[in-house]
Amino acid sequence: DNKDPVSVQSAMDDIAKKYGGINTIVNAAGFDIPQKFIADIDIDLWKSVMDADINGFFNLIKSGLPYLRESKGSIVFISSAGLFKYPPGDVLSVAPKATIEHVLKGIAKEDGKNGVRANSIALGVIDTGIFHRLREENNTFFDDAWHESVMNTLALKRFGYPEEVANTAVFLASSKAGYITGHCIPVDGGYHI
């Protein structure tokens, strides 16, 4: 449970002990966030999503930073292209990520002197099992009209593949990206332009 700081610290310590340290943290944790317009979101759902996303990220980074300072490591956060161009009905996904983006900039600025780099990847629509499940549910956000309208916004005229995201994360975590910090890299097929 990423909302429990004791549990997160224990897991981080166990991983560091097993592998002799930690040099990269990739935060790709997430859950099925409902697509809702702002006016339709009740406060309990809002608080639950913010707690899981923002506080979960904070707990992970707070427990991992000492290890990253030792290894001069890297943080890679999986974010959303909705940061660049807001998709209506996606505030529950985008709002916490906007907060986390600023926390990453803070880490990049404050811990750069310790060799820690902090970056994110802003995902567009990625062709995954979750995406197909949402389409099959045939809700109003993922119907054929939505599919066509999104496809029309993409410069590459296709959805992304998981390996394209993974390759970007591996690059950002590697020494090849050793002079990149505080940035959000779009992997969105040109959605943001």
Tell where the protein language model's regions lie, with residue ranges.
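C-terminal substrate-recognition "lid" of short-chain dehydrogenase/reductases
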Residues: 67, 158-187, 192
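Conserved NAD(P)H cofactor-binding loop of Rossmann-fold oxidoreductase domains
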Residues: 28-34, 190
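Short, flexible catalytic-loop segment of classical short-chain dehydrogenase/reductase
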Residues: 101, 123-137
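Substrate-binding pocket helix/loop in short-chain dehydrogenase/reductase
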Residues: 36-38, 45-48, 150
